[in-house]
Swiss-Prot record:
RNaseP catalyzes the removal of the 5'-leader sequence from pre-tRNA to produce the mature 5'-terminus. It can also cleave other RNA substrates such as 4.5S RNA. The protein component plays an auxiliary but essential role in vivo by binding to the 5'-leader sequence and broadening the substrate specificity of the ribozyme. GO terms for cellular component: ribonuclease P complex. This is Ribonuclease P protein component. Consists of a catalytic RNA component (M1 or rnpB) and a protein subunit. GO terms for biological process: tRNA 5'-leader removal. It comes from Thermus oshimai. Belongs to the RnpA family.
Length: 151
């Protein structure tokens, strides 16, 4: 019997191989999400999406805010009634696919952190394209501490 024929052979239990077994979670992928939601990051694992910082005036106001710099990210923030985030990744970082990857990683890191209410601006440096998720996480956390937003 060839390996390619193995997938088409019915299982010996008499159950259709395309149907989940009795031990499978009845709601599919939500079981995996529920497991990921356990632990110290549980509040943000299934939290609402981040609100975007919009408008040129909001970005200009942040120039007067507190600043923290890291190797991959510069952080600027001002206290505000709600958390809003602006992420800037210039074309110096790379082509669109690379810039979007950096933005997605930064957004996910922010979702995992417990941040106070503030208007927050993240500016990625060109070196951010080479950084992995863990490196970005450490660098952003360090920059947020330097800026005084988190302890």
């Amino acid at each position: 019997m060839d390996e390619k024929d193995l997938a088409t052979q019915p299982q010996e239990t008499g159950q259709d191989p395309r149907l989940p077994g009795q031990d499978a979670h009845p709601r599919g992928a939500q079981g995996a999400e529920a497991q990921a939601a356990e632990g110290p990051l549980a509040a943000h694992a299934q939290g609402a999406p981040l609100k975007s910082l919009k408008g040129d005036s909001a970005f200009r106001r942040l120039r007067q805010g507190r600043t923290g710099r890291g190797r991959y990210v510069t952080v600027r923030w001002l206290p505000a009634p709600e958390l809003r985030v602006g992420i800037v990744v210039s074309k110096k970082v790379g082509k669109t696919v690379v810039r979007n990857r950096v933005k997605r990683r930064l957004r996910e890191i922010l979702r995992r952190l417990h941040l106070p209410r503030a208007h927050l601006l993240l500016v990625a440096t060109p070196e951010a394209r080479e950084a992995g998720f863990a490196e970005l996480f450490q660098d952003l956390t360090r920059a947020l501490k330097k800026s005084g937003l988190v302890q």
